[in-house]
Amino acid sequence: MKPWYQKAVFYHIYPLGLLGAPKTNHETSAACRFDELLQWIPHIRDLGCTALYIGPVFESTGHGYDTRDLHLVDRRLGTNEDFKNFVDQCHQHGIRVAVDAVFNHTGREFPAFRDIQEKKEASPYKDWYRGVNFGWGSPMGDSFGYEAWQGHYELPCLNL
Protein backbone atom coordinates (compact mmCIF):
# COMPACT_ATOMS: atom_id res chain seq x y z
CA MET A 1 0.00 0.00 0.00
CA LYS A 2 1.30 3.45 -0.94
CA PRO A 3 1.94 6.03 1.78
CA TRP A 4 -0.71 8.77 1.97
CA TYR A 5 1.55 11.42 0.42
CA GLN A 6 2.03 9.39 -2.77
CA LYS A 7 -1.73 9.39 -3.34
CA ALA A 8 -2.38 12.92 -2.13
CA VAL A 9 -3.26 15.88 -4.30
CA PHE A 10 -1.35 18.85 -2.89
CA TYR A 11 -2.18 22.53 -2.84
CA HIS A 12 0.74 24.87 -2.10
CA ILE A 13 0.59 28.07 -0.08
CA TYR A 14 3.49 30.47 0.50
CA PRO A 15 1.95 32.18 3.55
CA LEU A 16 4.35 35.12 3.88
CA GLY A 17 3.36 36.27 0.40
CA LEU A 18 -0.31 35.30 0.37
CA LEU A 19 -0.98 36.96 3.71
CA GLY A 20 0.90 40.16 2.93
CA ALA A 21 3.44 39.78 5.71
CA PRO A 22 6.18 42.41 5.90
CA LYS A 23 9.18 41.50 3.72
CA THR A 24 11.61 41.90 6.60
CA ASN A 25 10.92 40.51 10.04
CA HIS A 26 11.13 43.45 12.41
CA GLU A 27 8.03 42.37 14.29
CA THR A 28 8.22 42.47 18.06
CA SER A 29 4.94 40.68 18.68
CA ALA A 30 3.16 37.97 16.73
CA ALA A 31 0.56 38.90 14.14
CA CYS A 32 -2.38 36.51 13.85
CA ARG A 33 -2.48 35.94 10.09
CA PHE A 34 -3.22 32.19 10.12
CA ASP A 35 -6.91 32.98 10.69
CA GLU A 36 -6.90 34.57 7.22
CA LEU A 37 -5.97 31.16 5.78
CA LEU A 38 -9.08 29.49 7.18
CA GLN A 39 -11.16 30.82 4.27
CA TRP A 40 -8.94 28.83 1.87
CA ILE A 41 -9.74 25.45 3.40
CA PRO A 42 -13.12 24.95 1.62
CA HIS A 43 -11.56 26.11 -1.67
CA ILE A 44 -8.68 23.65 -1.32
CA ARG A 45 -11.09 20.83 -0.50
CA ASP A 46 -13.49 21.77 -3.35
CA LEU A 47 -10.60 21.55 -5.83
CA GLY A 48 -10.18 17.92 -4.79
CA CYS A 49 -6.94 18.51 -2.93
CA THR A 50 -6.30 16.22 0.01
CA ALA A 51 -3.15 17.86 1.36
CA LEU A 52 -1.67 21.29 1.87
CA TYR A 53 2.03 22.01 1.35
CA ILE A 54 2.63 25.18 3.35
CA GLY A 55 5.73 27.13 3.99
CA PRO A 56 8.09 28.19 4.93
CA VAL A 57 6.57 28.94 8.32
CA PHE A 58 9.51 28.98 10.74
CA GLU A 59 10.94 32.18 12.24
CA SER A 60 13.14 33.90 9.68
CA THR A 61 14.60 37.27 8.81
CA GLY A 62 13.21 37.71 5.31
CA HIS A 63 11.70 35.39 2.70
CA GLY A 64 11.28 32.46 5.07
CA TYR A 65 14.08 30.24 3.81
CA ASP A 66 16.62 32.11 5.96
CA THR A 67 15.55 30.32 9.13
CA ARG A 68 16.63 31.68 12.48
CA ASP A 69 14.54 29.45 14.78
CA LEU A 70 13.12 26.02 13.91
CA HIS A 71 11.09 25.93 17.13
CA LEU A 72 8.95 29.01 16.43
CA VAL A 73 6.47 29.94 13.76
CA ASP A 74 7.43 33.20 12.05
CA ARG A 75 5.91 35.96 14.16
CA ARG A 76 4.79 37.73 10.97
CA LEU A 77 2.31 34.84 10.61
CA GLY A 78 1.35 34.23 14.23
CA THR A 79 2.24 31.95 17.10
CA ASN A 80 2.85 28.23 17.35
CA GLU A 81 -0.65 27.93 18.84
CA ASP A 82 -2.16 29.87 15.89
CA PHE A 83 -0.48 27.46 13.48
CA LYS A 84 -1.63 24.43 15.48
CA ASN A 85 -5.21 25.72 15.35
CA PHE A 86 -4.95 26.19 11.58
CA VAL A 87 -3.58 22.65 11.11
CA ASP A 88 -6.36 21.28 13.34
CA GLN A 89 -8.94 23.00 11.11
CA CYS A 90 -7.34 21.49 8.01
CA HIS A 91 -7.47 18.04 9.59
CA GLN A 92 -11.14 18.52 10.52
CA HIS A 93 -11.82 19.09 6.81
CA GLY A 94 -9.85 16.03 5.73
CA ILE A 95 -6.79 17.96 4.54
CA ARG A 96 -3.37 16.77 5.65
CA VAL A 97 -0.60 19.33 6.12
CA ALA A 98 3.05 19.07 5.07
CA VAL A 99 5.40 21.86 6.12
CA ASP A 100 8.07 23.22 3.78
CA ALA A 101 11.09 23.18 6.06
CA VAL A 102 14.69 23.86 5.16
CA PHE A 103 17.31 21.63 6.74
CA ASN A 104 20.35 22.10 4.49
CA HIS A 105 21.01 25.75 5.33
CA THR A 106 20.03 28.43 7.82
CA GLY A 107 19.85 32.18 7.88
CA ARG A 108 22.68 34.31 9.24
CA GLU A 109 20.60 35.04 12.37
CA PHE A 110 20.48 31.34 13.34
CA PRO A 111 22.00 30.99 16.86
CA ALA A 112 24.79 28.59 15.81
CA PHE A 113 25.92 30.90 12.99
CA ARG A 114 25.76 33.94 15.29
CA ASP A 115 27.96 32.05 17.75
CA ILE A 116 30.61 31.54 15.06
CA GLN A 117 30.46 35.24 14.22
CA GLU A 118 31.01 36.09 17.87
CA LYS A 119 33.48 33.42 19.05
CA LYS A 120 35.10 32.57 15.72
CA GLU A 121 37.42 29.54 16.02
CA ALA A 122 36.41 29.05 19.67
CA SER A 123 32.78 28.42 18.69
CA PRO A 124 31.60 24.87 19.33
CA TYR A 125 29.41 25.29 16.21
CA LYS A 126 32.18 26.02 13.71
CA ASP A 127 31.85 22.49 12.28
CA TRP A 128 28.08 22.81 11.87
CA TYR A 129 28.60 24.77 8.64
CA ARG A 130 30.34 23.71 5.43
CA GLY A 131 33.56 25.29 4.32
CA VAL A 132 34.15 27.45 7.38
CA ASN A 133 37.57 29.00 6.81
CA PHE A 134 39.09 31.55 9.15
CA GLY A 135 41.74 32.40 6.55
CA TRP A 136 39.43 34.62 4.47
CA GLY A 137 36.32 36.73 4.90
CA SER A 138 32.87 36.32 3.42
CA PRO A 139 31.22 38.73 0.96
CA MET A 140 28.87 39.61 3.85
CA GLY A 141 31.75 41.09 5.88
CA ASP A 142 32.33 38.14 8.20
CA SER A 143 35.89 37.48 9.36
CA PHE A 144 35.58 33.92 8.03
CA GLY A 145 34.41 32.29 4.86
CA TYR A 146 31.77 29.57 4.44
CA GLU A 147 29.80 27.78 1.76
CA ALA A 148 26.51 29.39 0.89
CA TRP A 149 23.43 27.89 -0.75
CA GLN A 150 23.81 28.52 -4.49
CA GLY A 151 26.09 31.49 -3.77
CA HIS A 152 23.53 33.29 -1.59
CA TYR A 153 25.67 34.23 1.39
CA GLU A 154 22.64 35.08 3.49
CA LEU A 155 22.03 31.29 3.49
CA PRO A 156 25.03 29.47 5.03
CA CYS A 157 25.05 25.72 4.26
CA LEU A 158 24.91 23.25 7.10
CA ASN A 159 27.56 20.54 7.22
CA LEU A 160 25.25 17.55 6.90
Task: Identify what each model region corresponds to.
Residues 1-99, 104-160:
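N-terminal structural segment of carbohydrate-active enzymes
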